Amino acid sequence: MKINLIAVGKLEKEYLNLYLSYLKKISFFATINLIEIKEINEKNIDLKKQKETELIIEKIPKNSKVYLCSLQGQEKTSEDFSLLFNEDNLTFVIGGSNGVDESTFLHKISFSKNTFPHQLFRILLVEQIYRSFTILKGIKYHK
C-alpha cells in the first residue's frame, strides 16, 4: 500500500522525531511518501491559495484517491477512518496556513472542528494512520 502526504511547508525539527517514530511503525504496513510544497510568499490570500493548490495538484500521483484534511470535511471516528485504508493508493493533503482552494478537492475529511497548527496536525495524521492499521490488523493499541 502507498500513502502520500502532501503538505505545504516544511516539518520543523521539534516535530521530526515523533513524526519519524510513527513512520517507522507504519512501515510494517505501508510506505509513506511525504511531499512538501514550498509555501508561496504572496500577500493576496486568494492568489496564494490558488498557487499552492496548483502546486499540490501537480504532485498528486496518478490513480491515487485524494483526501483533503479540512475543517469543512466529514468527521470520522478512528474506526471509520481506518476503512479508508482498504484502498491501495491514498493521498492526504494538508494545506498551508491560509488553506487551499477547497472546491478543487472531491473528498474532504476532518479530525475535529478545532484548528491545529499544521506542524502538529502532521503528527496527528500519521498517528491516526498508524492507529488505523492497528485497528485493521487487530493489534492492541486502539482502545
Curated annotation (Swiss-Prot):
Cited PANTHER family: METHYLTRANSFERASE, RIBOSOMAL RNA LARGE SUBUNIT METHYLTRANSFERASE H
Q: Using the UniProt record, give the first listed, main subcellular location.
A: cytoplasm
The enzyme class is transferase
**Which HAMAP family would you find in this protein's record?**
23SrRNA_methyltr_H (MF_00658)
Entry similarity comment: Belongs to the RNA methyltransferase RlmH family.
Q: Briefly state the protein's biological role.
A: Specifically methylates the pseudouridine at position 1915 (m3Psi1915) in 23S rRNA.
Keywords linked to the UniProt accession: Cytoplasm, Methyltransferase, rRNA processing, S-adenosyl-L-methionine, Transferase
Record note on quaternary structure: Homodimer.
Per the UniProt entry, the Enzyme Commission number(s) are 2.1.1.177
Q: InterPro entries under this entry? A: Alpha/beta_knot_MTases, RlmH-like, tRNA_m1G_MTases_N
Q: Does the keyword S-adenosyl-L-methionine apply?
A: yes
Task: State where the protein is found.
Answer: Cytoplasm
User: What's one GO MF term for it?
Assistant: rRNA (pseudouridine-N3-)-methyltransferase activity
GO cellular component terms? cytoplasm
Its name, as the record gives it, is: Ribosomal RNA large subunit methyltransferase H
Q: Which reaction does it catalyse?
A: pseudouridine(1915) in 23S rRNA + S-adenosyl-L-methionine = N(3)-methylpseudouridine(1915) in 23S rRNA + S-adenosyl-L-homocysteine + H(+)
Which residues bind S-adenosyl-L-methionine per the record? L68, G95
**Gene label:** rlmH
Stored Pfam families: SPOUT_MTase
